[in-house]
Structures are given as structure tokens and as C-alpha cells.
Amino acid sequence: MKTDRHKYNNDTYYVGIDAGSVSLNAVVIDSKKELVFESDYKRHFGRLNQELYALVEMLFSRFGESDIRAIGFTGVHGQALSETLGVLYEFETISQVLGVLAVLPNVKTIISMGGQDSSLFQIKHGANGWELGHFNTNGPCASGTGSFIDQQAERLATAMYEKSKNISQDQIDRVLGDFIQLGLKSDNPASVACRCTVFTKSDMIHLQNKGERLEDIIYGLH
């Protein structure tokens, strides 16, 4: 495998991997705690082990296996992977807050939307540092999470492109981008139920059948 190590000074590196329900993402910091690398957003489509192996191989090639001092995991699949590999693990909620504060020390509100969880953190800052003022997350229902929005983008693809379209897994990112951009064209969001994804989907189908503009339906969903 071709190496890209010439891009980095000789140093020691620390890798954090978010093994989520939908995607696999990684960041690398150096000994000065400076961010030196962030991987592209990568959907694993259930092929978690294969995608993880490819990701780690790429990181070893780029930074040098001997120069990577530690690897840590977070995310839905992070704990199981960390136990299997004998490496560090941190709860995703803690990782999200500490990670954002490291990049934006004065942040007051953090919203995390994952494949199956959405979370809200409100941070209070004072003379003695920061503290968590409020936290909330969704329950067992996946309403308002990334997976449901993905599903609706795929479902509406035929209407969006005005022709029958079979969406491959590799095309979903482009479809999702078009889905979001179409919704941004609306200035009149349709009324869509926010209680549950079952009701939300039913409302969206009903609005389509009534002839509501697609961009208004998508904007209402968001």
C-alpha cells in the first residue's frame, strides 16, 4: 500500500474511531493534541469489520503503525470493538461534549444527530470552567434521527428525479444531498407529525397524494 507519511512530521499519534450504527469515522491528533487528520464520512452498510480493517490499514500506512500510540473507540459499536481489540472506549455522549469543547471552547449548545440517536447538550460556562446544564435524548423511537431521513430520501428519489430510480448504497450520499437542497427551496413547510416516524411517514405520503409540493414536504420533515 502506498504511504502518505511524507505529509506529516515525525511524531506520535492518537486515533479516535466513532463506530456508529450507520457510519465509521476517525480523527487523529498528535502529541500536542492538535487535529492532524479527519477521515471522510464513511457508511459501513453493516460491513463494519471489513470497513474498520480498511480504515486502520489506511491509518497505519499514513502515520506508521509504530507511531500510533493508542486507538480509542466510541459509538454504538465502539464498546464491543474495544473489548475485542483490547483498546480504549468512551461513551459517545462524553466523547461528543469533550470533542466539541476541545474545538469550540465557548460553545453553549451541542446537537448530535446520529443514525439512531439524537441528543441535545446545553453547556454552562463559569469562573470554575464549564458544566452540563441540560441534556436530552430520544427514547427507543428513532424519530428525528439520521436513519429515518436517509430512508425518506431513498423513498422520495423517484419523485425527486421524476423517473424510476433504483438507489444503490453507494449513491445514497448524493441522493441525500439533493433531498436536503430541495427542501431548502421551500418557504412554506408542510405540517408533518413529529410524534413518531410511523405517523411522520404516513403524513408525508398523505401530503404527496394531496399534491403538496415535494420541497414543502421535505422542509416540513426537517
Where do the PLM segments sit?
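Adenine-nucleotide phosphate-binding core of ATP-dependent small-molecule kinases
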Residues: T200-H222
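Short glycine-rich, Thr/Ser-proximal phosphate-binding strand/loop in the N-terminal lobe
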Residues: D11-A54, E131-G139
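Residues on a specific face of well-ordered alpha-helices
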Residues: Q50, A54, L98, A102, ...
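Glycine-rich phosphate-binding loop plus the immediately following alpha-helix
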Residues: R47, H125, E131-L184, C196
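Active-site nucleophile and cofactor-binding loops and adjacent substrate-binding regions
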Residues: R43-F45, A70-F73, V87-L98, I111-G115, ...
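Short beta-strand-loop/turn "lid" adjacent to the catalytic site in phosphate-handling enzymes
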Residues: D40-H44, F60-T93, F121-Q122
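Gly/Thr-rich phosphate-binding beta-strand-loop-beta motif of the actin/hexokinase/Hsp70
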Residues: K2-K33, V107-G126, C196
